[in-house]
Amino acid sequence: MLNNVKCLVYGYGNPGRQDDGLGVELALRIENDEHLSKYVDVDYNYQLNIEDALTISEYDLVIFADAALNIDKSYELNKIQPAHTITFTTHELSAESILALCQDLYNKKPECYMLAIRGYEWEMGLPMTSRAKCNLDDAYTFLTEFIENQFSRCIAGKGI
């Protein structure tokens, strides 16, 4: 926590399925970063769960990180809004749905972003592709600067 701003980086995906684990790998990098880990909490899982609404309700700033197949850049950051979506299984629960549940159940609306990291292959039991690793490096560098800028804005009194 810095200047009373609580920040969470939540990575999700399956590390056993090649590039699908990009979100988890990013979260692990943040967790192992001696500087950032002092100010940012980290969580990760295979997929988002309904219980994550309670988790994010305890933060001011939440950055979800996941692998993405359909983006043109190595990574993409977008601010997300709450969205009530109905899915057949909880396996498809979106970050927007988690934010909507957080707002409905806990009357909290943290500022949330989705950091999509470009992946290429999703085969079981194979290592992450080299191109995805390069995208992970780019996303990590970007996220480090983004978080530091967000905290600088708070210190300057400009909010998150």
Where are these regions (language model features)?
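N-terminal catalytic or cofactor-binding beta/alpha core of small enzyme domains
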Residues: 1-119, 126-138, 143-160
